[in-house]
Amino acid sequence: MVTIRADEISNIIRERIEQYNREVTIVNTGTVLQVGDGIARIYGLDEVMAGELVEFEEGTIGIALNLESNNVGVVLMGDGLMIQEGSSVKATGKIAQIPVSEAYLGRVINALANPIDGRGKISASESRLIESPAPGIISRRSVYEPLQTGLIAIDSMIPIGRGQRELIIGDRQTGKTAVATDTILNQQGQNVICVYVAIGQKASSVAQVVTSLQERGAMEYTIVVAETADSPATLQYLAPYTGAALAEYFMYREQHTLIIYDDLSKQAQAYRQMSLLLRRPPGREAYPGDVFYLHSRLLERAAKLSSQLGEGSMTALPIVETQSGDVSAYIPTNVISITDGQIFLSADLFNAGIRPAINVGISVSRVGSAAQIKAMKQVAGKLKLELAQFAELEAFSQFSSDLDKATQNQLARGQRLRELLKQSQSAPLTVEEQIMTIYTGTNGYLDGLEIGQVRKFLVQLRTYLKTNKPQFQEIISSTKTLTAEAESFLKEGIQEQLERFLLLEKL
């Protein structure tokens, strides 16, 4: 018979008592009542926060958006096909955040900051909340540095400053994305980090943009955040905030950033879909009541920081698509009222071969003129005035056949000025090139040329001045002013090239 030793038993019991740990972990859990259409209704989750991430039993993550008296409405960040009624859900205690680092440059990622370009994981030691508060009034300073787009029409008449929000608005297929990508290409060597956010676009369109940026070496300073048309509405809604969080990371590190949202109409549609499925009451055009706040809290994050915070900046170029030129629809009017100006692209101008198809008459920049360099101000004022007068005269001249000589001259000048604003895609011009181009047009040097010869002459003139009158560009880049000396170099160059050009054309 086995002898039972009481001292051994008491030792074991004592050890067990000493090892006993009374730590209690409280997990906030709930049960799935209903799931479908990217929405789940959860019973329980009593302590959940608005916007908190929740995790389903099979691994899908969701965001708690509707906190109701008897259930919680959760939007899913995935298809959620494996979620079953009655399965458990636990709150994570975290608000949506993404990892951020310099390693994201040159990469294509999704709204959760996971790479989708097949080039491996991205290392990051820091993280930022996707929805962080915008800088306050004291944290900002007024816009004073220019952000050059490389497009004459914009940089001369609708200038953009670093820290500004400028809307690009127009119908489909009017070149909105082209204006945005040209602006990214023009930031080469300007020490500006670019973030391009594609929301609900065709995957082929996004691939095209990425390829054109790679070919021209622009991906080195660019991050692409893409949620294509087949992505869940939740991720399309989150993508712009992810892009803003990445741009903010660089802005607070005393760098300049440019962010493009292409386009916010699709984000609003994704948000409308989520809201209607969550049974939130619909308003105008069936959008929920807080669709203005959706865009205002995003665009207010663009800022020019004060000198105490390092003078970093975040310039936002949101894109909005209109239906047959209707700028008075709900989303366009909302975004126009939030931004500091808009660039209006017209389908009629586009079809008439005027590209970029910018309607200068109704495009405006509310703060950018403070950021223009002096040399550009000197030449752009005259250009604006002459184009405005030309537009007015052109409308009148359609009704009248016998025009006096002065009117005919003014119309001829206007047609040539319109011609000099035309630019090929992916061919941005430097400020110096823009100044020489505008000066040539406004001072009548193009009046003797046929309209068809204008662009050919300007291309040759820019090359000629670059090689034979480099002093002009040096003076402009160092003084930022069109000095008398610079003007004399420019006049000489134009006269010489004009004589050469006319001689060669006659042969």
Swiss-Prot record:
Recorded topology in the membrane: Peripheral membrane protein
Site note Required for activity, residues: S363
Keyword Ubl conjugation belongs to the record: no
Matching Gene3D superfamilies: 2.40.30.20, ATP synthase alpha/beta chain, C-terminal domain, P-loop containing nucleotide triphosphate hydrolases
Signal sequence coordinates: none
Catalytic activity as recorded in UniProt: ATP + H2O + 4 H(+)(in) = ADP + phosphate + 5 H(+)(out)
Major subcellular location class: plastid
InterPro entries in the record: ATP_synth_asu-like_sf, ATP_synth_asu_C, ATP_synth_asu_C_sf, ATP_synth_F1_a_nt-bd_dom, ATP_synth_F1_asu, ATPase_a/bsu_AS, ATPase_F1/V1/A1_a/bsu_N, ATPase_F1/V1/A1_a/bsu_N_sf
Location within or outside the cell: Plastid, Chloroplast thylakoid membrane
Binding site residues for ATP: G170, D171, R172, Q173, T174, G175, K176, T177
Superkingdom of source: Eukaryota
EC number: 7.1.2.2
Annotated positions of the Phosphothreonine modification: T257
Record keyword rRNA processing present: no
GO cellular component: chloroplast thylakoid membrane; proton-transporting ATP synthase complex
One example GO MF annotation: proton-transporting ATP synthase activity, rotational mechanism
PANTHER family referenced in this protein's UniProt entry, alphabetically: ATP SYNTHASE SUBUNIT ALPHA, MITOCHONDRIAL
Subunit (UniProt): F-type ATPases have 2 components, CF(1) - the catalytic core - and CF(0) - the membrane proton channel. CF(1) has five subunits: alpha(3), beta(3), gamma(1), delta(1), epsilon(1). CF(0) has four main subunits: a, b, b' and c.
Family as reported in the entry's similarity comment: Belongs to the ATPase alpha/beta chains family.
The protein's name in its UniProt record: ATP synthase subunit alpha, chloroplastic
Gene that encodes it: atpA
